[in-house]
Amino acid sequence: MTIKHLVISGGGPIMIQILGAIQHLETNKIVDMKNIESIYGTSAGAIVGVLICLKFDWETINDYIIKRPWQDVFPIKVQNIFDAYTKKGIFDIKTIEKCFKPLLDAKDISMNVNLEDFYKLSNIELHLYSFEINEYKVHDISYLTHPKLSLMSAIQMTCGLPILVTPVCIDNKCYIDGGMACNYPLNYCIESGKQPDEILGFKNKYIDEKENVNSDSTILDFLLSFLFKAVFSVNTDHNQQQIKHEIICDSHYLSFDIFKKTLSNVEVRRDLFKNGIETAIKFIEQYLKIE
């Protein structure tokens, strides 16, 4: 069966593991990016989807993600924290633009490209998931639902982890990180009519205990801990349909310390990439048994 659709979980640094896994699968002819028709992603998973839609060679993407000094793009300064009071987040759309500008420039794509035009360039149906807090529900953000929305705003909407990234407020709606209620949008993919056997999913499995807040915790540790526990209180795993092709990515709970280490340490990013390859190797062993 040909894989035509990807469903990719959010989870911060997990995106580097998923990139490693996808590349190993394509190298071993389990999946061919030329056959991908649609991608469903939340938060970091949405970023992976955008990278795939840009259609760079893997070496270019790897160098960009692993070797770029990301601590310069996401500086943690006292002023940023003070500014967050009025901006509702430490990082805003300017940071999102810094992340993607070199890539879009290399493809001669405008920073203001909207979802409709981005679809015409990639010919891949990209669905990003965001949580709207006023109506308190998940929104599918794509060229079908928001054709004139800029790609940068769409990324901010799905990656707007409260406090860290400013929410997007438009049309009396306030959009934050889709992982708050839909970290793995598998059901949305299936319900849109996609054949389950043509879907490849990348799903998180957390392998460590959630860190408790204590007297040494920072305000960001406190907030991230609260957000993760809020997410798991509305865990939808038991409602998700089962698919034949699903890669389980072992992951650590996101803490501010892990966030900083991933941004600042090339070796940490390399290890995450290698972990993704190892995950893909295990999947291939099982895949060959059932195909």
Feature-to-residue mapping (PLM):
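Patatin-like phospholipase
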Residues: 1-42, 47-291
